[in-house]
Amino acid sequence: MAKLGLKKLLVTLASISGIGKPCVAHVLVVIFLEYFAWGLLTMPMIATLKETFPDHTFLMNGLVMGVKGILSFLSAPLIGALSDIYGRKLLLLMTVTFTCLPIPMMTIDNWWFFAISAISGILGVSFSVVFAYVADVTTKEERTKSYGLVSATFAASLVIAPAMGNLIMELYGINTVVLIATLVSTSNVIFVLLAVPESLPRKVRSSGLSWKQADPFLALLRVCSDPNILLLCIVVFTFLLPEAGEYSSVPAYLKLSMGFGFVELSMLVAFMAILSISANVSLGSIVKIIGAKKSILLGLFLELLQLILYAVGDEKWQMWLAGNVAALSSITFPAVSAYVSLYSDGESQGAVQGMITGMSGLCNGLGPAVFGIVFYLSDMDLNEDRLLNRSVNEDRTAAGPFMFGAISVFIGILLASYIPDEKTARGSKEEFSALKYIIEMDEEVPTS
C-alpha cells in the first residue's frame, strides 16, 4: 500500500503542467541551478576532504568520485528507459533531487556526506534525462546546437560559483555556504516541480521496459560491430579517462600540493570556464575551417600538452598555463559528436551517439578512481603540511597520474589519425545505418 501511495504521489507531482510549452530553456535553468549549487561547494569540499581524510586525501577523493561515476554509468540507461515510460518530468524531478541530496549532509557529518555523494550516483544522472528532454523539443537540425547550449550552461555555472563559495566561506564559514547551496538546490527542485512542463506526450511513451533498454554494457558490446565506430570509441576512452580523473583531482592537487590559495584557485576555475565556453562556441567555425577529424586531433594535442605541463610543472604560472590549455582542449568530445553528426545519417546518429555517451559514462567512473589510486601509489596521499614542505625534486612522483594520462592521450592521437577522413566517412553512411539495425534488432543486417 505504501509503495502504491508513493507511486501515486510521484505521478501526481509529475502531472503539474508547468509554465509555457516545453523548450530547451527549461532544462538550461535546471542544469545551471544544479551545478551552480555544487560549484559553490568546490572550495568547501576540498577543505572538508582534507579534514576527513588527512592521510589519504587523493585516494579517497578518487574512490568517492569513482563509485559515483560508475553507479551513474550503470543506472543511466535504466533512468533513460524509465523516462520513456513515465515521462521526462518525473525522472528529472527524481534525478535532480538525488543529485542535490548530499549537499545539506556536509554540515551534519562529513562521512555521511561523502557516503551519500557516492551512492547518489544511482539516481543522480540528470544529464541523461536532460538530453532526452532536449531531443523531445528540438528538430534533428537544432539538436546538436542545443546539446552545445547544455554543455555551455554547465560551464557557465562554474564561472562565478567557486569564487562566490570561497568568499562566503572566508567571511561566514562553511555552514553558510552549505546553507546557500542547499537553498539553490531546493529552488531547483521546486522549479522542476512547478515550472518545467512535460515534454513527452503520453501517446508516444513506451509501454514496457526490456533488459536491452536498461543494460549499460549492451551498447558498448555492440561497438565491435563496426571497425570505424570501434576505433572512434577507443579514441574517446583514451582521452576521457584522464580528463575525468583530472576533473576530480586537479583542484585538490593545486590546493594541497602546489600551494594555491582558495581565492587563486577560484579565479583559475572561473577563467577556465570562460575559456571553455569560448572554445565550444567557436567549435562550429573550427570544424568548418579544418574539418571534424582535424578538430578532434587539435583537441587531443591540446589535452596532451596540458597533461605534460601538469606533470613537469613546478611553478604556479605553469599550472595556470596548463589550466588554460585544458579549457581549450574541452572541444575534443564535442568535436567527436560533430564528426558523428556530420558523417552519419539521421537514423543511425542516435545509436552511435549512444555508444559514445556510454563510453563517456564509463570513463567518468573509472577516471577518478584510476587517478586516485595512481596518486596513492605515487605517495601523494600526505597531509598538506608535508606536501608543501617537500622539495620539488623529491616530489616528482606527482607526475605519475598526469604522465599516465599523457601516455593515454598520445595513444589516442595515434589511433585518431586512422579515423576515416571526410570523404571516406561520407561514403560510410550505409555502414552506420547497418550498425543501427544491429544495435536495435540484435541481429545481423538482412541481405537480399
How would you name each of these model-derived features?
Residues 2-21, 197-233, 256, 432-444:
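Juxtamembrane intracellular "pre-TM" segments in multi-pass secondary transporters
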Residues 32, 102, 112-125, 317-331:
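Hydrophobic core of transmembrane alpha-helices in multi-pass small-molecule transporters
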Residues 44-58, 248-265:
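Short amphipathic helix-loop junctions that connect adjacent transmembrane helices
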Residues 45, 125-138, 331-345:
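Intracellular juxtamembrane helix-capping segments at the cytosolic ends
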Residues 74-108:
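Conserved MFS/SLC helix-loop-helix module at the cytosolic interface between two early adjacent transmembrane helices
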Residues 75-87, 279-292, 375:
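Helix-to-loop junctions at the C-terminal end of transmembrane segments
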Residues 90-104, 182, 294-309:
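Structural signature of the two symmetry-related core transmembrane helices
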Residues 116-155:
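Cytoplasmic helix-loop-helix junction between adjacent transmembrane helices
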